[in-house]
Amino acid sequence: MADWYRLAWPLICGLDPERAHHLAIRALALGLAGHDRAADDPVLACSLWGRRFANPLGLAAGFDKNGEVADALFDLGFGFVEVGTVTPRPQAGNPRPRLFRLTQDRAVINRMGFNNQGMEAMAARFVRARPRGVLGINLGKNKTTEDAAGDYEAGIAKLAPLADYLVINVSSPNTPGLRALQGREPLSLLIARARAALDAACPGLRPPLLLKVAPDLTDEDMADIAEVALGGGLDGLICTNTTIARPKSLVSDHAGETGGLSGLPLRYRARQVIARLYGLTKGALPLIGVGGIGDGAEAYARIRAGASLIQIYSALVYEGPGLVGRIKRDLAQRLRADGFASVAEAVGADHRDPKGASGKLAPRSPL
């Protein structure tokens, strides 16, 4: 934990979590969150989808829902930033309280419900000032929309020209019926319409189209998603969103709250999903690993399991912005210790040599 963040932690804990989040956005907007001036180790550099990433560590969607502070987030040292989830129309989300810290478990439960200012506000912001790093935009549907694919088409039409990659989010547990879109038939239809919308919006060089999936998938579900992804024109998968499962190990007061659980308890399951989907796709589809990553050891484990890139979010709540640099330094050391000259060389290494990882992996979670 950065010294200033450690000192501020008692004050942060005393604030309502959503209030603390708004203050964090404000601090970033004012340039008060700091700047990582250290150059990234060259071993961390990645190339994917024709884009260059200075390092593979990104910020997951959900933090900067409206694209207000992307440049300030790049200043913290992230290799890429994913904003959103954004919907075609502004919406308030679910009633408060809807965000809960599980401090003893190093976890968070949220039932935000895609609260955001809408795609027009985000587009206007990025037209005025395009963020200087690799930018992902995470797309969702409005709660009251019956034609879900129509909302994703609208988001693609408006925001595709402004993004380095787009994400179709059908895995949040906080929008009724959304996860049903992960089934083989509805997903195939959705991806076909999204791809057509993307081709129309960017007839030349189009941004990659990714799908964000849930951790609460059966082996059959994952096989279906892999088949659709490979045959339906997706450029990658993000694994995983929050879980509706509640491991018996949770001890925090808010463990029984409704919503999606993120953070440390999700670590093993999210890694397991990455490994499974890497195997099902035979490494042919880039994967972004997210869920329970809070240190360099797990970042490295996720890459060895099959992730080309990784993302964090919940761990920042407990560790602060200094975590970004710590993960990158540790990851670089682990790559070199195992003889890898690049991140790309390590992707999926456990499928080739499951006993070759340096360091000790996190224990298996009961989730």
Swiss-Prot record:
- InterPro entries registered for this protein in UniProt: Aldolase_TIM, DHO_dehydrogenase, Dihydroorotate_DH_2, Dihydroorotate_DH_cat, Dihydroorotate_DH_CS
Q: How is the cofactor bound?
A: Binds 1 FMN per subunit.
User: Which key words are in the record?
Assistant: Cell membrane, Flavoprotein, FMN, Membrane, Oxidoreductase, Pyrimidine biosynthesis
Q: Does the keyword Translocase apply?
A: no
Q: Which GO cellular component term is one of those annotated?
A: plasma membrane
Q: Which reaction does it catalyse?
A: (S)-dihydroorotate + a quinone = orotate + a quinol
**Which PROSITE patterns does this one have?**
DHODEHASE_1, DHODEHASE_2
What is this enzyme's EC?
1.3.5.2
Pathway it acts in? Pyrimidine metabolism; UMP biosynthesis via de novo pathway; orotate from (S)-dihydroorotate (quinone route): step 1/1
> What broad class describes the main subcellular location of this protein?
membrane
Residues given in the record as substrate binding sites: 65, 110-114, 169, 174, 241-242
Catalytic residues as annotated in Swiss-Prot or TrEMBL: 172 (nucleophile)
Alphabetically, the GO molecular function entries are:
dihydroorotate dehydrogenase (quinone) activity
Cellular localisation: Cell membrane
- What GO biological process term is on the record, naming one? 'de novo' UMP biosynthetic process
Keyword Heme set for record:
no
Q: Which domain of life is it from?
A: Bacteria
- The residues that the entry says bind FMN are 61-65, 85, 138, 169, 212, 240, 263, 292, 313-314
Q: Which cofactor does it need?
A: FMN
Give the first-level EC class, as a single word.
oxidoreductase
Mode of membrane association: Peripheral membrane protein
**Tell me, how does this one assemble?**
Monomer.
**Record function comment:** Catalyzes the conversion of dihydroorotate to orotate with quinone as electron acceptor.
Say which family it is in.
Belongs to the dihydroorotate dehydrogenase family. Type 2 subfamily.
Q: What is this protein's name?
A: Dihydroorotate dehydrogenase (quinone)
Name the species this protein comes from. Answer: Rhodospirillum rubrum (strain ATCC 11170 / ATH 1.1.1 / DSM 467 / LMG 4362 / NCIMB 8255 / S1)
Q: List the gene name.
A: pyrD
